[in-house]
Amino acid sequence: MNNEKRLPSLEKPWQKYLPKENLGIEVPNKSIYEYVRDNAQRVIDSTAIEYFGTKISYRSFLERIDRFADSLKAIGVKEGEYVSFLAVTFPETITALYALNKIGAIANFIDPRIDVEGIKQLILDAKSKVLFVLDFAYPKIKPILED
C-alpha cells in the first residue's frame, strides 16, 4: 500500500462520474452568492424561483438575499458561524442559504421529519447560535429549547 498522502482535491476521483464534455469546465473561484449575483445581471428580470405559481425575479431574489443578510448581521451572525434551520425547501430557505453565504456564515439545514434527539444532536454538533423553525416543526423543537 502506498503511504504517501493522497489529496482528493488533486486526484478528483468524482470526475469518473461526469460526462467527458464536462471535464474541461472551469469552476469559478466565487461563492455561490457571488456567482448568482454576477450572472443575474444578464437576466435580472427573469424568473429565478417559481414556487406554486409564484414567480420571483432575480432582481427580487437578490433584494431578498441582501435584506436577509443584513438582518442576520443585525442579530449578530458572523462569518464562520452556523445557523440552523428546521425547515423544508421553499423560497425563504433558498434565500437564507444565499444570504448566509454572502456573509460567510454556514447553513445547517435540518430535516424536520427526523426525531427530536436527532434534531438536538445536529444543533449541538453545529454549535448553532441562531435557529429558524417553521411553525409546524415547533412541537419538535419545544422540548429541546426547554432542556
Tell me the role of every PLM-derived stretch.
Residues 1-2, 102-147:
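Structural core segment of the AMP-binding/adenylate-forming
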Residues 1-29:
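Flexible, non-catalytic linker and terminal segments flanking ANL/adenylate-forming cores
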Residues 20-22, 44, 105:
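Residue-level signal for pocket-adjacent positions within structured domains
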Residues 24-27, 60, 107-110:
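Short, flexible loop segments at the rims of nucleotide/cofactor-binding pockets, characterized by
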Residues 27-28, 33, 37, 45-90, ...:
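Conserved AMP-binding/adenylate-forming core of the ANL superfamily
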Residues 39-40, 144:
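Hydrophobic helix-cap positions at the C-terminus of alpha-helices
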Residues 41-42, 109:
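Charged/polar positions on well-ordered alpha helices
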